[in-house]
Amino acid sequence: MSDHHPLKEMSDSNSSPLLPEPLSSRYKLYESELSSPTWPSSSQDTHPALPLLEMPEEKDLRSSDEDSHIVKIEKPNERNKRRESEVSRRASAGRGGFSLFQAVSYLTGDMKECKNWLKDKPLVLQFLDWVLRGAAQVMFVNNPISGLIIFIGLLIQNPWWTIAGTLGTVASTLAALALSQDRSAIASGLHGYNGMLVGLLMAVFSEKLDYYWWLLFPVTFTSMACPIISSALSTIFAKWDLPVFTLPFNIALTLYLAATGHYNLFFPTTLIKPASAAPNITWTEIEMPLLLQTIPVGVGQVYGCDNPWTGGVILVALFISSPLICLHAAIGSIVGLLAALTVATPFETIYLGLWSYNCVLSCIAIGGMFYALTWQTHLLALVCALFCAYMGAALSNTMAVVGVPSGTWAFCLSTLTFLLLTSNNTGIYKLPLSKVTYPEANRIYFLTVRRSEEEKSPNGGSGEQSHGSGQWKAEESSETVLPRRRSVFHIEWSSIRRRSKVFGKGEHQERQTKEPLPCPYRKPTVELFDLDTMEESTEIKVEANTARTSWIQSSMVAGGKRVSKALSYITGEMKECGEGLKDKSPVFQFLDWVLRGMSQVMFVNNPLSGILIVLGLFVQNPWWAISGCLGTVMSTLTALILSQDKSAIAAGLHGYNGVLVGLLMAVFSDKGNYYWWLLLPVIVMSMTCPILSSALSTVFSKWDLPVFTLPFNIAVTLYLAATGHHNLFFPTTLLQPATTTPNITWSDIQVSLLLRAIPVGIGQVYGCDNPWTGGIFLVALFISSPLICLHAAIGSTIGMLAALSIATPFDSIYFGLCGFNSTLACIAIGGMFYVITWQTHLLAIACALFAAYLGAALANMLSVFGLPPCTWPFCLSALTFLLLTSNNPAIYKLPLSKVTYPEANRIYFLSQEKNRRASTITKYQAYDVS
């Protein structure tokens, strides 16, 4: 870093934290740091910030700058008088209330002056500062005063836990020093907070009584592993500029508890069991004072404390550093409490704050910490907290099966998902990790960036952020890396006609298309054969026969074109329909998007196919169809609200996961049909699909991979795990693992039912077991793409044969449960994302077979947790095969932005091959001439 960095100059010139400094000079310093090329780029040094009480200057940012370009000419005596008045005013302000204001600013925010003052002090004092900051960093607070208050709160809860937590922080910080980690990160406490949580929670979950001193040995060793895990995760997450949060703590604690367990002789842990019966809840017994007490208790549970006084003390510590962090902590705790009530959680669990602590952390992280605080990100923080609450319930129920607590896994996974969200909305601004400090300073940084970008824009600061500058320009450039599928199933029919010469059609047909036809039945002016090339001495009879033959052939060609053009309006992706609706009512456009979303489950971008699929769903079960349509509508609306790519929305790419969520939640509901309350969780879970899809796309864009139905799998798995069979409001179907050998008599097999399993397996993609529904789906696929229809049937057949090869019970085969994953895998590889050749056709069959066996494996594994496999086997197997690399030119993986449907994909591939060969021949000829 340069020696003339303004931050260093400030720290050198102001070694005493009690030296007053005007806020205006601090703001100028902040603005100079913003434009300085020597801004520290380390993603771990996240604390170059302003004091908290500089927030009131936020309102003067625009007004003070707008007048900066006005030149005022004044006389020398007037200038001297103005300077004297300013000096006297500043002096009076320094003698008055301003000194108190300045003194308070040294205790709030991240107390950077204190850190600078300690640089030349004994190492013991510096280390104490690091430990205190590490204790507060659990709640995203970089303030030693807050850390000291938090230690007081922990002592109120349990002194033994405090000792273990302190030891964990010290051991973790020392390990980071020994490993020569970034010194600024250590000084900010970023290598201490995970150790604090490890020490606390190991003491909390210990079955031994307090002051079991032998426990400090595993606390020391496990805490020392945190900097190693943190550094490793930072290396990976740096690709997406993401923080590691409390993942090192989660990994270390989970490994320790799984390694010891309840029956360990030296270090026994608390016994955790899954729910085995429906809870007995009487709503009249709910106690409002205890519910209100849950708010501070939920905040305290971040540190594993259930004492409301401890939670209150921690809230005070947060308020000292950042009132916005304190506010979002309380809001997050309330959201977790309300989410618990919506799924009939036992009151004791709610009163203990076990539903709230993950929401507290998520709400803080999204509400101003890693996103600049706007009303959009405030709402996003509420949604993230709600999503985190349900994910916490799902993980608690799932991990209880193996006797392990959920820790803060729910917070980490949900918040990372929301941080990976990409949006064209300028109000959703994710800060670079190196600029993250605390919400108030983050917002000032955001306003400064936006104002500077508005000044650089051609419009000169019209008050609306240009999408082509600054952060927003960076976001758009990153979206170009992620193939922006203007339509994943998109191809120009004119380009198909141009490329039709690849199949050997004559150039005369291309000339015919260039000439306008005033009437569709007009005889083409260009004949099939060029008569000028014939000899003048040809007999009249031969000329007449030739002319008649050419007229018949040209008429057949024209008729074939008319039929082909008519079919093109209802086959393929029906691009003409989408373009024709652009100037129509938004209602018709939205209906088109929803119908395309219904068919995109099967990789079909065709509204007519979508209508047939909806018809097939009503044939199966009208209630399921209603739930599925609602899921599609809500998922599409959410994508619009989040300003996702409009062309992807129009292609139905933000709707198909929603339809599967709605359908499968109705299928697995134990309440039966027309349980209207089920539509509430259908709406909530469907709305998470665009968020999950955007986050996964950000990750998968590194390898140019689609997200497939992973958002649906995540959403439905979380919902089913969070509710379960014993939930009072939303009970689900009971799934249990096999405990006995199935009784199979091969002579009892029925060939007719096996054949019927082919359409049933296709219908099971939507959760339907009606063969007529599966047949309607096949017709819908055939209308859009015969190749998709063919590979769907092949995939279902392969799944059935694979099930027979491992002696699967016949009922499972007849119901198509072994065929739907193979169906999707065969379509994806057989011409959809690979160009269709005989090699990729065989590859599709192999992928379908692999998906069938993987489906059986996951079904057996997930049944232990009471969960269905959904389409996890398809996603994992298809992604595995798409990551395949080969030197065989016939195995050609299409760029994601060029994927349409198999027939058009092959035309694109052949045209590329033709261009490549032509360029190769040209290069060879040029080389030969030279």
UniProtKB/Swiss-Prot annotation:
It comes from the Eukaryota. GO terms for cellular component: apical plasma membrane; basolateral plasma membrane; membrane. It is found in: Apical cell membrane; Basolateral cell membrane. One of its GO terms (molecular function) is urea transmembrane transporter activity. Residues 1-11, 56-89 have a biased composition (Basic and acidic residues). The chain crosses the membrane at residues 145-165, 185-205, 213-233, 242-262, 280-300, 311-331, 350-372, 401-421, 610-630, 648-668, 676-696, 705-725, 774-794, 813-833, 842-862, 864-884. The modification Phosphoserine is found at S487. InterPro entries: Ammonium/urea_transptr, Urea_transporter. Gene3D superfamilies: Ammonium transporter AmtB like domains. Residues 1-90, 452-479 are annotated as: Disordered. Glycans are attached at N743. It is a multi-pass membrane protein. Residues 12-25, 32-43 have a biased composition (Low complexity). Pfam families: UT (PF03253). Keywords: Cell membrane, Glycoprotein, Membrane, Phosphoprotein, Transmembrane, Transmembrane helix. Belongs to the urea transporter family. This is Urea transporter 2. It comes from Mus musculus. The gene is Slc14a2.
